[in-house]
């Protein structure tokens, strides 16, 4: 059958091109040498890029040397080499640049690669499996860019990439909406339990 996926949109044909992640990404290290005051972000397992103030409420950067931090722009990627195997990899969607810890690995998509498609690829179970296989270390696995770049995969035309990305992004949005509805229903149920079952005390 060739190098094609099991499930495919009918308008596309032809084999996907074999490659490595190093063929479709470009590693970069843009340091904040000018000490530009930018918002500080972290890469989380489930929420992607978030302001550090949301993750560490008491974080105070006054007097901290920020020239070693890395600058990230819209559509750039970053991951935590010690936690990529549990989902700590994301694409930055902010309209203005931010800065992140120097510990993160940063990269961009090459020409001909859709960033949204790439993000779905990098979070796919098969690719995540290879994060562990290609990582180094004992109890904690570290995956730095040279080993990340060796992971083998395949990619279709840019048109097919975008079609796939649009579908998967739509499904993600529906799941997010449904989860919010579930959370509201759970809150409602708790309120009903208090009103219907719990007796007044005192």
Regions found by a protein language model. Give the residues of each.
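Short amphipathic coiled-coil heptad-repeat segments
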Residues: 1-14, 177-202
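A short glycine-rich beta-alpha junction/loop motif
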Residues: 2-6, 82, 98-103, 136-159
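Non-catalytic DNA-recognition/assembly elements of restriction-modification systems
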Residues: 8-32
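DNA target-recognition patches
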Residues: 28-63
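A short beta-sheet element
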Residues: 64-127
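Extracellular/lumenal glycan-associated surfaces
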Residues: 162-174
